[in-house]
């Protein structure tokens, strides 16, 4: 009996994950908020998923390039794996390596993400576990007018809770207002206490 198209597709994903040296038993398909790729990013462990949310929520990171994972170019060393390339708000480009047992947070030109780093950032990881899907749900909508309204409200009132912004913009969809706020957070135009 032949395989169904869905089984063939799943086997392709598993083969690509195994080709980069990871286990195919725990797959996560995520869509980075700033990503324009048609296909989602495939992560193969809970640690990779947490590292993804950690990077997306890092307040000093302007953008994240996951091409090392996407194109199977993730260099590996014992105990380390190239995970992404980040550009900081200052414009510095850093290689990010997943190193679960590392005892340092970074070395020259590299940022290491270890279990201790992820454990110390549990609130950030949990917060961005909700923020990223909020952004992605609004991808098909034009948020620009709402983003402008949110900026105006913040300029007028200073700090506002998301709930207060939704009340101020009661004529708009709450989902779209929260999507606009989440987009502003990810673009680092505003700061929040989600860490």
Label each PLM-derived region with a short phrase.
Residues 1-195:
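Electrostatic, structured charged patches in enzyme active sites and in nucleic-acid/phosphate-binding
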């Amino acid at each position: 009996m032949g395989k169904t198209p869905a089984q063939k597709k799943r086997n392709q994903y598993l083969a690509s994950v195994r080709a980069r040296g990871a286990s195919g038993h725990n797959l996560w398909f995520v869509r980075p908020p700033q990503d324009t790729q048609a296909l989602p990013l495939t992560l193969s462990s809970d640690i990779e998923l947490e590292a993804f949310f950690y990077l997306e929520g890092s307040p000093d990171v302007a953008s994240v390039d996951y091409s090392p994972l996407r194109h199977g170019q993730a260099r590996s060393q014992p105990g380390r794996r190239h995970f992404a390339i980040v550009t900081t708000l200052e414009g510095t480009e850093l290689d990010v390596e997943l190193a679960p047992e590392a005892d340092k947070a970074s070395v020259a030109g590299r940022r290491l993400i270890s279990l201790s780093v992820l454990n110390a950032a549990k609130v950030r990881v949990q917060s961005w576990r909700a923020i990223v899907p909020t952004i992605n749900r609004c991808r098909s909508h034009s948020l620009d007018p709402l983003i402008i309204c949110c900026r105006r409200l913040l300029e007028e009132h200073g700090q506002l809770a998301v709930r207060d912004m939704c009340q101020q913009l009661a004529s708009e969809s709450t989902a779209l207002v929260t999507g606009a706020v989440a987009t502003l957070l990810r673009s680092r135009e505003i700061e929040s206490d989600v860490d």
